[in-house]
């Protein structure tokens, strides 16, 4: 999908819409070494009554040779193994060997993508011995092993007459594996452009071999595999075997380790903290009113299961203050909590200012509390490192975010690939600016602006190169261009991170999740915002 950065023009939402239109019942996501789009894909499939199959394309090493493998999760154990494998790939710069694969086979189906495999290279060099040895090793460790044949192979008479016959003699199972890197045949230009952008603006040689990597309709695929219908039947067989169930909406909160019952400890800290606060009040107050409010808030927090959440925030705020790291007085709805005020998390008395606790936390609205804490931007990392050390490297991570193609970036990159001169590029921007001078459109797509500008349409009609640049820029807008780190978000988990999300390298020796903040929150994980301010 689009989440194989600059390797695919296949956007998840339009892909699922197309699958639904074609009345297809299942689809497998197989990105290159990463699982960035897994949750979005899974949710979008379920929303449209299409069965999601979770997969991963793995590059592994064996005897100084590199081979590719497609792995699909049969069950949740397999899904866990995919997350481990993807994490290993990203954290070791794609350094996975055969021995590691042997340890992580449970719950997985393996498919050798013939056209991208070392087996094809061996056979084309008439080295059947090494080809079969490679296949036998894989067959030995994966109880469900297939050779996947794409359109290029199945329509190649030389392959069918020679190599296919040889492979069939060894009783391997075969499956149709038409690779999809872009949705419509007309999206080939967007795909080649993305690959060129990855290749420093230079079109990739031999990419014409990928022309068939679009989503073929059912009739076309049935025609292509007409003489090998068993391969199509195996796609259904595999889809039926794969039944990963990802749970959403259930909180997976970490525990604050104090050696005491969390709620009892929270209650004790709040009582001590509130007494200290009241001793410093310079205004009259009703003590009973404060304790009634405190007990009410504590009961709500306890009923909703958030005692540990408040203790975790209290702990790192206390660390910051103890180490002379300035902490903001509170922002958003958090200052409406007397518990937060009593713990020293915020500095605003919610009763004095008549702030409603329900704006912050409400039993009728099932959502995680959201306490954003401000730190000086030059000391924020100290607090994050403290949290990482306290809860362990395997339980604390930065959060992934994508840098996507915005209008200007898409046009600039396409102009570079197709060598559009500066004069024409400036002309495009002049008309783009003119069409939205009065901000009539809120965050418009490039396509919307072109449709609203007769001048841009005229340019496209008169100049083929401008037409090409703008047409492709429309197609790649909003596709991820690079990965980045969420400006403030940190996730803390109850158990090892890899039980919930695959991992990437992060900053300051702290891992980074492969899932975005929205995905992590859907999984019920605890996201906390450590905001860095200059002033």
Model regions and ranges:
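Alpha-helical scaffold/interaction cores of sigma-54-like transcription cofactors
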Residues: 1-535
């Amino acid at each position: 999908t689009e989440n194989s950065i600059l390797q695919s023009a296949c956007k998840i939402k339009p892909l699922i819409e197309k699958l639904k239109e074609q009345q297809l019942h299942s689809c497998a996501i197989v990105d290159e070494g990463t699982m960035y789009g897994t949750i979005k894909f899974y949710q979008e499939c379920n929303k449209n009554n299409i069965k999601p199959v979770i997969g991963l394309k793995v590059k592994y090493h064996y005897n100084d040779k590199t081979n590719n493998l497609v792995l699909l999760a049969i069950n949740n154990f397999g899904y866990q193994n995919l997350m481990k494998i993807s994490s290993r790939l990203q954290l070791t710069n794609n350094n996975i060997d055969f021995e590691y694969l042997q340890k992580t086979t449970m719950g997985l189906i393996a498919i050798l993508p013939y056209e991208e495999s070392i087996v094809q290279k061996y056979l084309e060099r008439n080295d059947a011995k090494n080809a079969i040895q490679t296949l036998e090793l894989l067959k030995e460790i994966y109880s469900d092993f297939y050779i996947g044949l794409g359109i290029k192979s199945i329509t190649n008479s030389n392959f069918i007459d020679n190599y296919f016959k040889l492979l069939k003699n060894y009783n391997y199972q075969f499956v149709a594996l038409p690779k999809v890197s872009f949705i419509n045949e007309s999206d080939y230009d967007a795909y080649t452009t993305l690959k060129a952008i990855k290749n420093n603006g230079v079109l990739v040689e031999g990419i014409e071999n990928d022309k068939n990597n679009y989503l073929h309709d059912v009739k076309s695929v049935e025609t292509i595999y007409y003489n090998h219908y068993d391969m199509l039947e195996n796609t259904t067989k595999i889809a039926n075997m794969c039944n990963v169930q990802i749970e959403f909406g259930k909180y997976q909160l970490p525990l604050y380790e104090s050696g005491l019952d969390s709620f009892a400890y929270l209650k004790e800290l709040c009582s001590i903290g509130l007494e200290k606060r009241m001793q410093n009040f310079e205004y009259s107050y009703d003590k009973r009113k404060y304790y009634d409010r405190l007990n009410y808030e504590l009961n709500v927090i306890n009923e909703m299961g958030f005692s540990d959440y408040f203790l975790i925030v209290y702990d790192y705020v206390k660390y910051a203050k103890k180490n002379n790291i300035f902490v903001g007085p509170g922002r958003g709805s958090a200052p409406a909590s007397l518990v937060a005020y009593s713990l020293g998390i915020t500095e605003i008395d919610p009763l004095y200012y008549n702030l409603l606790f329900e704006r912050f936390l409400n039993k009728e609205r099932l959502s995680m509390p959201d306490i954003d804490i401000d730190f000086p931007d030059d000391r924020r990392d100290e607090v994050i490192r403290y949290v990482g050390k306290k809860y362990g490297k395997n339980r604390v991570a930065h959060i992934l975010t994508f840098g996507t193609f915005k209008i200007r970036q898409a046009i600039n990159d396409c102009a570079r690939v197709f060598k559009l001169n500066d004069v024409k590029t400036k002309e495009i921007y002049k008309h783009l600016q003119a069409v939205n001078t009065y901000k009539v459109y809120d965050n418009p797509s490039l396509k919307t602006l072109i449709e609203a500008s007769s001048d841009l349409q005229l340019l496209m009609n008169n100049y083929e190169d401008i037409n090409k640049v703008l047409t492709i820029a429309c197609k790649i807008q909003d596709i991820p261009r690079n990965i980045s780190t969420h400006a403030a978000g940190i996730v803390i988990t109850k158990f090892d991170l890899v039980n919930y999300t695959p991992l990437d390298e992060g900053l300051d020796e702290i891992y980074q999740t492969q899932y975005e903040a929205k995905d992590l929150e859907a999984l019920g994980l605890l996201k906390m915002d450590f905001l860095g301010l200059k002033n």
